[in-house]
């Protein structure tokens, strides 16, 4: 996920891109009179002169109908389009037998959820511990229920070293004024990897694997002037959890922390805060705005999401 992540799929009357929450919010703010009720699992639908635009919770945005190219050019979204040739050039690769290396992996959870913190975890899995974690059933957190995550993670923490960082909504909103989402994630991933590297010294991983959310050159540009882990041993790949179990373990630890954070905020402020960014989220946000105001909403939610503007309209 680059701040504006590139993805593909283009046909004569259809185009799918991946946009950041900021991009979706900008489209909604620019075309308020064209907003329609979004379908299930989506956060925004616009109908503009024969063109239908649907933004989904996953970050995917589907453009259907007439005038796609004109709209893309008008809104300066050309850089998001990617030909299959460019895609093949950009596809990263890992060394042979990487999945059996001793690796430190990192992953984040919460960047697509309106309520709750952004959590980043790093986990170190030595080659000796790989069979044990596989036997335990460690896998990508998205493939597990919340209950399974909460049952699994304490056991994982007993077996491997890890580092967990949590960026709570109030601080997130403050930082988001000067840094984009991917810059925040880069700083957190780097810090989680560095702190865990110090924790396991003198042992050192054979490789570092970051669940890729932007191109490596952009990642390092965000970290200019920051101390880094060994760049020569650092790899980036999407769906990192399928390439090494260290990323899967980090994903589970980060997911558990996100769920705990959501529960903690729910208890503190007296609302059952849902995950995701769907219509149920809009309803709770509108209630908070109506009864408690923006000062409380900023403590529990990521305000730059399109949900904030929707909640404001619902409150009225």
Which sequence ranges carry the predicted segments?
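RNase H-like, Mg2+-dependent phosphodiesterase core
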Residues: 3-316
């Amino acid at each position: 996920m680059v701040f504006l992540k590139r993805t593909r799929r283009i046909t004569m009357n259809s185009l799918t891109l991946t946009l950041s929450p900021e991009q979706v919010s900008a489209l909604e703010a620019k075309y308020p009179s064209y907003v329609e009720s979004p379908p299930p699992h989506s956060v925004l639908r616009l109908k503009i002169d024969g063109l239908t635009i649907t933004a989904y919770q996953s970050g995917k945005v589907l453009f259907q109908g007439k005038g796609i190219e004109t709209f893309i050019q008008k809104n300066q979204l050309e850089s998001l389009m990617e030909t299959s040739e460019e895609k093949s050039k950009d596809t990263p690769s890992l060394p042979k037998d990487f999945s059996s290396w001793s690796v430190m992996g990192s992953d984040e959870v919460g960047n697509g959820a309106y309520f709750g913190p952004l959590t980043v975890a790093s986990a170190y899995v030595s080659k000796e511990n790989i069979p044990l974690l596989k036997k335990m059933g460690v896998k990508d957190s998205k493939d597990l229920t919340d209950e399974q995550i909460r049952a699994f993670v304490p056991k994982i923490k007993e077996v491997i070293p890890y580092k967990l960082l949590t960026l709570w909504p109030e601080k997130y909103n403050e930082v988001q004024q000067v840094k984009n989402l991917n810059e925040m994630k880069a700083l957190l991933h780097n810090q989680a990897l560095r702190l865990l590297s110090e924790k396991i010294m003198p042992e050192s991983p054979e490789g570092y694997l970051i669940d890729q959310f932007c191109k490596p050159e952009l990642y390092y540009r965000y970290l200019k002037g920051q101390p880094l882990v060994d760049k020569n041993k650092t790899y980036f790949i999407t769906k990192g959890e399928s390439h090494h179990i260290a990323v899967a373990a980090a994903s589970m630890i980060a997911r558990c922390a996100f769920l705990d954070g959501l529960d903690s905020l729910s208890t503190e402020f007296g609302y059952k805060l849902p995950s995701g960014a769907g219509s149920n989220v809009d309803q709770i946000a509108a209630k908070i705005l109506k009864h408690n105001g923006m000062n409380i909403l900023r403590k529990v939610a990521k305000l730059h999401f399109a949900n904030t503007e929707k909640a404001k309209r619902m409150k009225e």
